[in-house]
Amino acid sequence: MRRSGILMHISSLPSRYGIGKLGASAYQFADFLKKSGVSVWQILPLSPTSYGDSPYQSFSAYAGNPYFIDFEQLEEQGLLEHTDYADANWGSPNKVDYERLYQMCFPILKKAFQAFDRTNPDYVAFCEKHRAWLPDYALFMALKFAHNGKAWTEWEPELAMRNAESLQKARSKYIEDVQFFQVIQYWFYSQWDKLKTYCNENGISLIGDMPIYVSYDSVEVWSQPELFELDRQHRPIAVAGCPPDVFSPTGQLWGNPLYDWDYHKKTGYAWWIQRLAFATSIYDTVRIDHFRGFESYYSIPYGNPTAEIGEWRKGPNTALFKAAQAALGDLSIFAEDLGFITPEVQKMLDACGYPGMKVTQFAFSDGAKNTYLPQNYKTTNCVAYTGTHDNMTLNGWVYGASDKEISFAKRYLRVRDRKDLPESMLRITWGSIADLAIGQVQDFLQEPANARMNTPSTAFGNWQYRTTAKQFNHKLSKKIYQLNALYNRLPEEEDSAAETDTKEIEQED
């Protein structure tokens, strides 16, 4: 079935409290999607953010971001007063200020925690359900706060290396903070589950994003060092990244520790199966970031200042996904297969049967044989994007692309004026044979270059994009609905209205 989606992270939702929340504006956006004939909402990882504010560099592969917790729902539960949060200065409505959030959110959540009944049966059941990861995460965060946010590698050696007696003493000493971080996760997932249920009941599927790697300063590396290539002091032997290319002359040095794939193979990929089971339980579909890293991954010696020196090493390939399928059954997954894709990577993707990705912004650099041009799609089993969170907005792209790309795009799209290219690029994405077409919310809102979500290989100024409620008006909803009607991407229950709406487009054109 042909479908459409919009990519917008929770952080970008309209909100009066510094960042998007799992509250009223999230439900209103779901209503907007339904009204627009859109059946998919894609978000970025829900994980807590750390240094650099990236959801792809988190303290945990499982935890939810405390900043997204809706204060209004806590007030409704009698845990907060309205004045506890409503009168504060949350900064600009146009940009997320993560430093301000760090300073302001936790005292408010701590006040709600003090009023919370920790004997609540739902909370007790939540802790039991998530006992595989929650206790270690809560202790990790309690210790991090006790050490003024320092990385675990800077803690006392007996804590960094997880001496059993020292951990037990720390758990007793910081019991209130440990329980605080457990309660935060209970609130987060209670609100997330409620939102997901609402979306699903209204015909909207949620696509979540799973990074392939975890951060070095994460509870996984601290509590399960055997999963990674570390030395006896638990320092990385090598780290992840990408080799140099035309876009990045020195490559991309991500710095994530690499997996000990021999260990994972010996355990039957148990950790990965658990991680995939969790991801597919909180999302309807999971996008796996840097999928090519499962076939082969770029290894950079630890301590190197750039990614210029490194080597490709073999990953688990299809063995991991066969093990996951045997344990969990068929999973709703698609692969981020962008970048340096070899025949071996394509063979792995084909063997798994997962959809790959097509990005329209990449379509105009190599002439008529470019694989990202819709005419060259080989299968409907793919997801077509106007652009991803790592790309420029369409309006930004048309003023930043090379003259050669713009010239070809004009000829291909039969457009004379550069300013008309974004609309045509959106249309060919929707008109492609891809089963699912997704556009960045910025592209529907016709946002300029400074609305870009992330610029790879830059450390600051990313992940800050926000929207306002007035942007999601009836005019935009009608435009998106008509686009879906014209290109047969309406949900099945909306098909009967499609012919009428297509005629409206013809009349308006």
List the predicted regions and their residue ranges.
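Alpha-amylase-like alpha-glycosidases and glucanotransferases acting on alpha-linked glucans and related
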Residues: 9, 15, 53-189, 214-438, ...
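Outer-envelope exported proteins of Gram-negative bacteria
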Residues: 44, 205-207, 211, 285, ...
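Conserved, well-ordered alpha-helix/loop/beta-strand core segments that scaffold catalytic motifs
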Residues: 181, 186-214
